[in-house]
Amino acid sequence: MILVKDAIITGKKQDLLVEGNIIKKIGNISISEVSKDETEIIDGKNCVLIPGLINTHTHVPMSLFRGVADDIPLMEWLSGHIWPMESKLNEKIVYAGTLLGTIEMIKSGTTAFNDMYFFLDSIIKAVDETGIRSTIAYGMIDLFDEEKREKELKTAKESLEMIKNLNNSRITGALGPHAPYTCSKEILESTNALAREYNVPIHIHMNETLDEINQVVEKTGMRPFEYLNSFGFFDNVNTICAHCVHLSASEIQIMKEKNIFAAHNPVSNLKLASGVSPVLKLLENNIPVTLGTDGCGSNNNMNLFEEIKAAALIHKGVNLNPVAVIAKDAFDFGTKNGAKALNINSGEIKEGKLADFVLINMKKPYLTPKENIESHLVYSFNGVVDKVVIDGKLVLNDGKMVNIDEEKVYEIAEEAYFELAN
């Protein structure tokens, strides 16, 4: 058990008791109520306790791609830099990148993430060791080639079976077709069938740039959401669509009708000059918005607090509307909405929810005065957290990983980058 004493929880000083991996009680809890031998007591004085953040779109092993290709357009970035480097990936490199990336997320308050990448056994190994929660998909790209399609579907299915057989509630599977401009109709149709068979979500890039939309229109005569909807891709499945930058009215209507989650990646979209997602229109149509960092190659970090702030600010400026996205909504994008998208019983601090939470020391200049906590967390906090509990276990204590040798991780990450870049 874990007992957090005297933290600011939902606006007032309270205690919180964790039993197993569940928040058992919130309120005034005496130490005499618990067994001292079986309970870890955490002093929450001067701290605010918040739900762990949820990153709904990333490529965690790409922590090693940080800074390798800045200030260029997406298609040049992909074909000229990222894809050539990815051709050199191996299990060792992906393991090192995932260790580095998951530590970065935990140290900035993220407790769960939604990933699409390769070498899933290496990702799973690192996730298991760091203690973070994850939804993982093998990234399928068939480039309209039948032989490659069969291989990709086989690997995706094997990955789902592997994750299923882990019997680890922290690690769940998903299906990750890359995008409509890199995947054939056949692989996309098979994705829907597999998602229903395994009862897992679909994670896909959608409408990130005008160029990719034009590619789909030229091939099919329809915009990407219209094209996928024409053969039932969104039917009877939970779909998380990353980016959603350039959307027509009909596409927004499809998202609304099919209960699609938008994974908004404001920093990555700005850095690659892809554009700005019409989040205000999504909200007006009751389309749930979540937040992602994308990979470090296009961000260049995985600090979701930066995405929360960006989401709160950008849409004010774009819409000339100071209440386009208010602080509470932006924070919900990164917590409550993400939990719904990934079907995780978290995202809020309530009794009966999973014990995935973060403690932040408020004795900092950028978090003072303490009366305005909600505003500070969105507009002034830098993301450096003190303690993180995931699945009822303390994984970060006083800013340091509990069960991971951080120096060793930095060492193997540097070695992996050297192998990748040379």
UniProtKB/Swiss-Prot annotation:
Its cofactor is Zn(2+). The keyword Zinc applies. SUPFAM superfamilies: Composite domain of metallo-dependent hydrolases (SSF51338), Metallo-dependent hydrolases (SSF51556). GO terms for biological process: S-adenosylmethionine biosynthetic process. Zn(2+) binds at residues 57, 59, 205, 294. Substrate binds at residues 86, 178, 208, 294. Binds 1 zinc ion per subunit. Keywords: Hydrolase, Metal-binding, Zinc. Pfam families: Amidohydro_1. It catalyses: 5'-deoxyadenosine + H2O + H(+) = 5'-deoxyinosine + NH4(+); S-adenosyl-L-homocysteine + H2O + H(+) = S-inosyl-L-homocysteine + NH4(+); S-methyl-5'-thioadenosine + H2O + H(+) = S-methyl-5'-thioinosine + NH4(+); adenosine + H2O + H(+) = inosine + NH4(+). It comes from the Archaea. Its EC number is 3.5.4.41, 3.5.4.31, 3.5.4.4, 3.5.4.28. Pathway: Amino-acid biosynthesis; S-adenosyl-L-methionine biosynthesis. The keyword Phosphoprotein does not apply. GO terms for molecular function: 5'-deoxyadenosine deaminase activity; 5'-methylthioadenosine deaminase activity; adenosine deaminase activity; metal ion binding; S-adenosylhomocysteine deaminase activity. It is an enzyme of class 3 (hydrolase). Homotetramer. SAH is a product of SAM methyltransferases and is known to be a feedback inhibitor of these enzymes. As a result of this inhibition, organisms have evolved efficient enzymes to metabolize SAH via different pathways. The pathway found in methanogens differs from the canonical pathway, it uses the deamination of S-adenosyl-L-homocysteine to form S-inosyl-L-homocysteine for the regeneration of SAM from S-adenosyl-L-homocysteine. 5'-deoxyadenosine is a radical SAM enzyme reaction product which strongly inhibits radical SAM enzymes. Catalyzes the deamination of three SAM-derived enzymatic products, namely 5'-deoxyadenosine, S-adenosyl-L-homocysteine, and 5'-methylthioadenosine, to produce the inosine analogs. Can also deaminate adenosine. The preferred substrate for this enzyme is 5'-deoxyadenosine, but all these substrates are efficiently deaminated. Likely functions in a S-adenosyl-L-methionine (SAM) recycling pathway from S-adenosyl-L-homocysteine (SAH) produced from SAM-dependent methylation reactions. Belongs to the metallo-dependent hydrolases superfamily. MTA/SAH deaminase family. This is 5'-deoxyadenosine deaminase. It comes from Methanococcus maripaludis (strain DSM 14266 / JCM 13030 / NBRC 101832 / S2 / LL). The lineage of its organism: Archaea, Methanobacteriati, Methanobacteriota, Methanomada group, Methanococci.
